[in-house]
Amino acid sequence: MLSEITLGQYFPGNSFVHRLDPRTKILATLIYIVAIFLADTPIAYGILVAFAGLVIGVSRLPVALVFKSLKPIWIIILITMVIHMFTAPGEKVLFSWTIFKITEEGLILGSKMALRLILLLLFSSVLTFTTSPIVLTDGIEKLLRPFKCIGVPAHELAMMMTIALRFIPTLLEETDRIMKAQTARGADFSSGNLLERAKNMLPLLVPLFVSAFRRAEELAIAMESRCYRGGEGRTRMHELAYKGIDYTAFAAVICLAVGLAAMRWGASLCAL
């Protein structure tokens, strides 16, 4: 399961999406997330699915790789769907057993929430798959730079977020390595119920924390040896600049959000 977690991984390429400015991809992802919560009809969700499919296709990412990012959180998606199915109020009861009942409204709401989570994760995965950590840091820093006037440390925040994102696959690889080493010594992580498996994971914590601190120290030494002193006075080999493809991407995602907003509230405004 650990090998199936793809958060923080970068897939090199030269597609339309890879060549976009990182600021464009970050803002487009945020706008798409807003658009997800504007959707309220099957047609709107169909448009969102089609748009996500188009972006994945244009990015030339392996479809299996993109959907692999969903595997570790399928249980969360399923639990979210079930909770909404059983707790949402409704009149048309589809299933009833003792105190539990599933209504048509609950089934629809649960399906909507599950689809929203899937779309959110898929689109966010495209951002990390098509943007290297260094470029992502530059993009976040540029977006946060206007807030420096109120004391926001733009460069430091961007660096921390990127290092944290990059450390996720590193720590997962380390966890997998420790599990294999302990399995070779007779440890069993696959048998037993959920509680027993969780208890079997406890011996992993100490070596994992030790490894994490060691890697953090190695990273700090490497940055210091390269004379890293923060963002002040730093220059870059490649300066970020918006191009025609960035404006095209902005126009597409803004049209998507505006169109979904019009579908949701347009009829109400016309009635007024």
Q: Regions from the language model: what does each represent?
A:
Residues 1-44, 48-57, 142-145, 149-152, ...:
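Transmembrane alpha-helix interface motif
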Residues 14, 37, 60-65, 97, ...:
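Membrane-helix interfacial "entry" motifs
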Residues 25, 64-74, 246-249:
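Alpha-helical transmembrane segments and their helix-start/interface "positive-inside/aromatic belt" motifs
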Residues 51-61, 76-79:
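Alpha-helical transmembrane segments and their membrane-interface exit regions
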